[in-house]
From Swiss-Prot:
Keywords tagged on the record: Leucine-rich repeat, Repeat
PANTHER family reported in the protein's UniProt record: PTHR48051, RAS SUPPRESSOR PROTEIN 1
Gene3D superfamilies assigned: Ribonuclease Inhibitor
Family: Belongs to the LRRC69 family.
Alphabetical GO biological process terms: intracellular signal transduction
Repeat positions for LRR: 38-60, 61-82, 84-105, 108-129, 131-153, 154-175, 177-199, 200-222
Organism per entry: Homo sapiens (Human)
Keyword Coiled coil: no
Protein name in UniProt: Leucine-rich repeat-containing protein 69
Amino acid sequence: MTERLLIKALSGGKNTKIITLNGKKMTKMPSALGKLPGLKTLVLQNNLIPKVCPELCNLTQLTTLNLGNNLLEEVPEEMKYLTSLKNLHLSGNRICRFAPGACDGLQNLILLNLNNNHLTQLPQEVSRLKSLTYMSINYNQLASIPRELCFLENLVELQLNYNQLICIPEEIKFLKKLQKLLLARNNIGVLPEELCDLKKLRILDIAGNIIQIFPSGFQDLKLREFYCEGNPLFLQQPVISTQQENVWSLQEITSRFVMNQLAENNPFLMDDIERYPQVRSMISQGKTCAICGQYFITVWLECVRFVPPPKDWKISKNLKLVPLQVLICSYKCFTQRDPNLFGIAQV
């Protein structure tokens, strides 16, 4: 049956645009495919193919390639020759790596599906997928998101459910077009404040992680759907506690002075600071007190404010209050807080 279909396709020559050989128990990719340079769509899913044939390199007009549910162990190097490729489906394989150079020629790729594989990391070369709009890598073993992925400026949807992620890079803020972010069932403990810079984000799923509190600007996101069930969120259960005022280090006192002077555009400091990269690095970690608005480095006491989720959010069941992180610089500011702001106690 497979042979007849190939013979028929070959007889069409340059006019053959689509080949579908789904579920044919094929153990190798037919090398004869290389004689169809005008091929646009190639579907070889649900077979037993362990690697692609070298002749795949000839299919430079191919726009859709489906090799899902085969036995591939890597994203092959031959992919770099498919310069017209827009849709690449590689789900349900045994992929644990990208071959060197695999991403080099995929500047037109729009959709990449790597669900249900064995990836533990992504290469820095993913940054070369400049047109990528939809990326799905659910059910893998990723421990981190490379910062390079965050420079895919056309990315609209990113799915990383059921991995082993423990954090999200601050560079997430550069995904300005991102509308859908799925991170369910990972090991994420903290969401970066930079997540709140994603003005186009509409769907966020962080269910089944270990998140206790959300960044202070979280409520400003224009979400339509938000799912967070299965996280150990802080609850509004006040207890009586005491907190002593700290004695600041000289570094903290100096940093606060410098940052607050820079905020006032002190011309002498602005010129001098350029000559001291270590100082610039240190004050780049500065935070703003939610009470007095002054800058500081060391968090004196982490606080939380409980707010109801916006009414237009479609949310997880039973989510009544969202715990938002609030940072305060001193005991003095803590005593001036509003009654809906609580210090986080270790009990």
